Regions:
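Short beta-strand element of the alpha/beta-hydrolase
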Residues: 27-35
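Short beta-strand immediately N-terminal to the catalytic nucleophile in serine-hydrolase-like folds
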Residues: 102-104, 129
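N-terminal cap/lid segment of alpha/beta-hydrolase-fold proteins
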Residues: 1-24, 235
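Gly/Ala-rich beta-loop-alpha elbow adjacent to hydrolase catalytic centers
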Residues: 104-112
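The alpha/beta-hydrolase serine catalytic core
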Residues: 14, 110, 122-226, 230-256
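Conserved alpha/beta-hydrolase
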Residues: 45, 49-71
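Catalytic nucleophile-loop/oxyanion-hole region of alpha/beta-hydrolase
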Residues: 67-94
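Short substrate-entry loop that stabilizes the transition state in hydrolases
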Residues: 37-43
Length: 256
């Protein structure tokens, strides 16, 4: 999918955040949060956008600074900064009366969880896809060797190789992640909460989705374990499941 009809949102007078807003004049807006070093033009946002267009729902997607076509250096980004960017964009582009449904992919679920308290009165549903809250500490730092940790602590960039991708990891990224812990907090929102996770996810264990379920005490929870699904959950069958769950949440909101 291309960046057709996307625009830039200016933050702090210098960071330009790439975003796309589908305005169907609906009372419901679906917001998509992409993952670590990902973008807004993949299969999931594409399919969700098509669903929203067909079902008369507003849809907002965007790219954090240092990602995709947004400006800024990736190595200067962190969870706090990306959360703030998402908050400012949502507040600027969406009407205050809009009911929100957040969809977080991998790291996007962490950003979403950070924003639960901010939008608690408007948030009416959440879908997490291969959710990875606090992954910087549990999937990176704790597994790094002493040699790698020494490189990072010396304020150097460690390039983490993962398949075809290279992730530049910095000290400030790791340390900022520790300021954004969410798994020790209780979430008391009474909203539909659906977590989808593939059994063949080699990046993020199922336990991360289970951890979210544990802290959401009052939500109407559903855990969808997808057989043979990988981390991206971008097969046609995966995308259909995601949109089916979204449809259920939307129907519940409209019937309320």
């Amino acid at each position: 999918m291309s960046y057709k009809k996307s625009k830039y949102f200016l933050i702090a007078r210098k960071r330009r955040i790439k975003y796309f807003f589908l305005n169907k004049n609906s009372q419901i807006t679906v917001v998509f949060f992409h993952g670590f070093m990902s973008d807004m033009i993949g299969a999931k946002p594409k399919e969700i956008q098509k669903f929203c267009n067909k079902n008369n729902l507003n849809f907002l997607k965007f790219e954090y600074s240092g990602h995709g076509k947004s400006t800024g250096e990736f190595t200067k980004g962190n969870i706090s900064k990306w959360t703030k960017e998402a908050k400012e964009l949502i507040n600027s582009k969406l009407k205050k009366k809009n009911k929100l449904i957040f969809i977080g992919s991998s790291m996007g679920s962490w950003i979403s969880l950070n924003l639960f308290p901010v939008f608690k009165k408007r948030l009416k549903g959440f879908i997490g896809i291969g959710s990875a809250p606090e992954f910087l500490e549990h999937l990176m730092w704790k597994k790094f060797s002493k040699k790698i940790k020494k490189i990072i602590l010396a304020k150097k960039i460690y390039n983490l190789e993962n398949g075809d991708f290279t992730y530049p990891i910095t000290k400030q990224l790791i340390f900022d992640g520790r300021k954004n812990k969410v798994l020790n907090n209780k979430i008391n929102l009474k909203i539909p909460l659906v977590l989808l996770h593939g059994t063949n996810d080699k990046v993020v264990p199922l336990s991360f989705s289970r951890a979210i379920l544990k802290i959401c005490k009052k939500s109407k929870k559903k855990f969808v374990i997808i057989k043979n699904g990988d981390h991206s959950l971008s097969r046609k069958s995966d995308l259909k499941k995601i949109c089916n769950e979204l449809r259920d949440i939307v129907n519940n909101i409209r019937l309320a």
